[in-house]
C-alpha cells in the first residue's frame, strides 16, 4: 500500500498528549478531521485516530485518541504522519494530487501532438502553475486554469492544453 506524507510532528502542546505539527498537505481540514486515521511513516502498522484538531498560528494542533499524555506525545516528536492511499479520499472535479500530475504528457488539444512533460508544480497564488519540459529541454510555465488546461486524464497520464499566445516562447 502507498502512503503520503501529511505532517511532521514538531513538539508536544499541553499535558494531555496534543501535538503541534508542520503541515505537508494541501488538505489539512480533511486530513486532520475527527475520526481520520493516520500512521507514522516509520511504522505504518500503527494507526493514530484524530480525536480533534485545530489550526494554531502557521501550524496545526492534533489530539489523537491513542495518545493521552505528554510522555506518549513526546515519543512522537520528529515523526512524519502519513495517510494511506485508501484513506486519502476523492478530490472534487478539477483538483488533482501533485503526484498524479507529475510526469504527465502535455498534449496540444487542437493538433493532438505531444508538447512535453510536466516536471514541476508551483503554487504562487490563486492557481497552480505547471512547468512543461519539451523533448529538446526547453521549459515554460503554464497556468492551471480552464482557458489553458482543457482536460486531465490521470489514468492515461495526459494533460490536454490550449496554449495562449505568449505562454510558449517560439523561436
Curated annotation (Swiss-Prot):
Domain PRC barrel: 93-167
GO BP of this protein: ribosomal small subunit biogenesis; rRNA processing
Sorted UniProt keywords: Chaperone, Cytoplasm, Ribosome biogenesis, rRNA processing
Main location: cytoplasm
GO molecular function: ribosome binding
Record InterPro entries: PRC_barrel-like_sf, PRC_RimM, RimM, RimM_N, RimM_N_sf, Transl_B-barrel_sf
Subcellular location: Cytoplasm
Gene Ontology cellular component list: cytoplasm; ribosome
Family to which the UniProt record says this protein belongs: Belongs to the RimM family.
Protein task: An accessory protein needed during the final step in the assembly of 30S ribosomal subunit, possibly for assembly of the head region. Essential for efficient processing of 16S rRNA. May be needed both before and after RbfA during the maturation of 16S rRNA. It has affinity for free ribosomal 30S subunits but not for 70S ribosomes.
Free-text comment about domains: The PRC barrel domain binds ribosomal protein uS19.
Oligomer and partners: Binds ribosomal protein uS19.
Protein name: Ribosome maturation factor RimM
The organism of origin for this protein: Lactobacillus helveticus (strain DPC 4571)
Gene label: rimM
Amino acid at each position: 500500500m502507498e502512503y503520503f506524507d501529511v505532517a511532521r510532528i514538531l513538539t508536544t502542546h499541553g499535558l494531555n498528549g496534543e501535538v503541534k505539527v508542520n503541515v505537508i498537505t494541501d488538505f489539512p481540514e480533511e486530513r486532520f478531521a475527527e475520526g481520520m486515521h493516520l500512521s507514522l511513516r516509520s511504522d505504518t502498522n500503527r494507526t493514530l485516530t484524530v480525536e480533534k484538531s485545530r489550526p494554531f498560528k502557521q501550524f496545526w494542533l492534533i489530539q489523537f485518541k491513542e495518545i493521552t499524555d505528554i510522555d506518549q506525545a513526546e515519543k512522537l516528536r520528529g515523526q512524519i504522519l502519513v495517510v494511506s492511499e485508501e484513506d486519502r479520499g476523492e478530490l472534487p472535479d478539477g483538483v488533482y494530487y501533485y503526484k498524479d500530475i507529475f510526469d504527465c504528457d502535455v498534449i496540444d488539444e487542437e493538433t493532438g501532438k505531444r508538447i512535453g512533460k510536466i516536471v514541476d508544480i508551483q503554487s504562487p497564488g490563486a492557481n497552480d502553475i505547471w512547468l512543461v519540459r519539451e523533448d529538446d529541454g526547453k521549459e515554460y510555465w503554464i497556468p492551471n486554469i480552464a482557458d489553458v488546461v482543457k482536460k486531465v486524464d490521470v489514468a492515461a497520464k495526459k494533460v490536454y492544453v490550449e496554449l495562449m499566445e505568449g505562454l510558449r516562447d517560439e523561436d
